[in-house]
């Protein structure tokens, strides 16, 4: 995400969590949790006085998230699909999904599941890349996005994840 957003995703995530307006003694499910950035920002905001469940299909991402969150007792990690969460009905005050909704197999199932696990009056927030509407910026974006896989090859020695990222954004819209 640093490469794709030129690091701006950090500001987006911080703004996202601020907009969520987390309160202490609540419960968050962070779906497509990845490296745990949203969970960490949430817990920092409530001084670790809440509970968080990080959900991701990728076990390696969850391992990274555990390290980032220092394996806190009030944070739990689940390797699961967004379409079938291992939680009771009405369990969470907040449901977040960032940079993950475009990767699910069925958005309607994910949304249905999110509302199932949210308490009445709970908050659902989704953060995702989008298409650029400004024509001038869109031209810059198209040039930049075509160069991202090559930059990925240079920096991490791999183009596939970056090609997937660009393609998944294009296909989502």
Language-model regions, residue ranges each:
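Short beta->alpha hinge that forms the Motif I/post-I loop of the SAM-binding pocket
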Residues: 56-57, 106, 129
């Amino acid at each position: 995400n640093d490469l794709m957003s030129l690091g701006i995703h950090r500001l987006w995530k911080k703004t996202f969590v601020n907009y969520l307006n987390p309160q202490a003694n609540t419960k968050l499910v962070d779906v497509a949790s990845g490296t745990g950035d949203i969970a960490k920002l949430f817990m920092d905001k409530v001084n670790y006085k809440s509970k968080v469940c990080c959900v991701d299909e990728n076990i390696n991402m969850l391992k990274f998230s555990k390290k980032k969150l220092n394996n806190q007792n009030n944070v739990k990690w689940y390797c699961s699909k967004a379409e079938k969460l291992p939680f009771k009905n009405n369990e969470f005050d907040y449901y977040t999904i960032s940079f993950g909704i475009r990767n699910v197999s069925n958005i309607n199932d994910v949304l249905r599941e999110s509302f199932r696990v949210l308490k009445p009056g709970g908050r659902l927030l989704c953060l995702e890349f989008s298409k650029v509407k400004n024509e001038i910026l869109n031209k810059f974006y198209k040039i930049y996005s075509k160069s991202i896989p090559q930059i990925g090859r240079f920096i991490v020695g791999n183009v596939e994840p970056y090609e997937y990222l660009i393609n998944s954004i294009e296909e989502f819209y």
